[in-house]
């Protein structure tokens, strides 16, 4: 497991370094042209054309109940268009979950996402969708142009997978989680006082 983590860290670092050396070359792959600034450690999306490696994002709900944070491997901003890229270095990307022969169904995530297959492709799709949703909470004018996984398997084969923006599912998940937090808080008020 340590070797896998080290490999993933090394691949992330190599890509990040290539961004600093020649961002224009790297961005042509995504149909983008022109000069882009590379903004390492800069967390305000105030530049018209910019690349943000390892972009930290944190959003608190208006009522203060929820705080969600994450780190986007690569965020590209072209005007209001946003591209989110995440690197995965695991052995494989599973596109289907385990098929249970006795129930004749694929395993799904827990409620409220219990219609979504429980496989790493869907986990990663939800992860990138959460990032996109959080960005739109910060600035509703942002347009999510693309969510992409770049998978580098253990034989160094690279596969780019464009994933769907599951905004509705993210909203359902956050609403459910917030409700659970509020219920837990209410129940904690009923605990007896010990003298």
Language-model region placement:
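Short, flexible/disordered intra-domain loops and linkers
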Residues: 95-103, 115-118
């Amino acid at each position: 497991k340590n070797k896998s983590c080290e490999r993933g860290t090394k691949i992330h670092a190599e890509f990040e370094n290539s961004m600093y050396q020649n961002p224009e070359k790297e961005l042509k792959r995504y149909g983008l042209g022109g000069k882009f600034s590379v903004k390492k450690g800069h967390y305000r999306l105030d530049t018209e054309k910019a690349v943000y490696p390892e972009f930290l994002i944190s959003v608190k709900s208006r009522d203060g109940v929820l705080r969600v944070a994450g780190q986007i491997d690569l965020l590209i901003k072209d005007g209001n268009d946003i591209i989110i890229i995440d690197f995965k270095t695991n052995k494989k990307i599973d596109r289907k979950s385990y098929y249970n022969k006795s129930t004749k169904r694929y395993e799904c995530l827990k409620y409220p996402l219990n219609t979504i297959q429980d496989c790493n492709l869907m986990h990663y799709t939800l992860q990138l969708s959460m990032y996109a949703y959080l960005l739109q909470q910060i600035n509703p004018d942002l347009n999510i142009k693309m969510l992409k996984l770049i998978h580098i398997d253990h034989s160094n084969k690279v596969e780019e997978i464009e994933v769907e923006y599951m905004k509705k599912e993210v909203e359902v998940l956050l609403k459910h989680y917030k409700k659970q937090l509020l219920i837990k808080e209410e129940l904690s008020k009923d605990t007896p006082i010990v003298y």
